[in-house]
Amino acid sequence: MQDVKTYLSTAPVLATLWFGFLAGLLIEINRFFPDALVLPL
């Protein structure tokens, strides 16, 4: 179990989880507010 915790705390795994979370969050925001990501010019 300690090896699994050590593996999950490494930088590539944390970066993958973080970017996956951010991508999902942006997709959900874009789904509910489709024009929010477009800069108003």
Swiss-Prot record:
<dbReference type="Pfam" id="PF01701">
    <property type="entry name" value="PSI_PsaJ"/>
</dbReference>
<dbReference type="InterPro" id="IPR002615">
    <property type="entry name" value="PSI_PsaJ"/>
</dbReference>
<keyword id="KW-0812">Transmembrane</keyword>
<keyword id="KW-1133">Transmembrane helix</keyword>
<keyword id="KW-0934">Plastid</keyword>
<keyword id="KW-0472">Membrane</keyword>
<dbReference type="GO" id="GO:0009535">
    <property type="term" value="C:chloroplast thylakoid membrane"/>
</dbReference>
<dbReference type="GO" id="GO:0015979">
    <property type="term" value="P:photosynthesis"/>
</dbReference>
<comment type="similarity">
    <text>Belongs to the PsaJ family.</text>
</comment>
<feature type="transmembrane region" description="Helical">
    <location>
        <begin position="7"/>
        <end position="27"/>
    </location>
</feature>
<dbReference type="InterPro" id="IPR036062">
    <property type="entry name" value="PSI_PsaJ_sf"/>
</dbReference>
<keyword id="KW-0602">Photosynthesis</keyword>
<keyword id="KW-0150">Chloroplast</keyword>
<protein>
    <recommendedName>
        <fullName>Photosystem I reaction center subunit IX</fullName>
    </recommendedName>
</protein>
<dbReference type="GO" id="GO:0009522">
    <property type="term" value="C:photosystem I"/>
</dbReference>
<comment type="function">
    <text>May help in the organization of the PsaE and PsaF subunits.</text>
</comment>
<keyword id="KW-0603">Photosystem I</keyword>
<keyword id="KW-0793">Thylakoid</keyword>
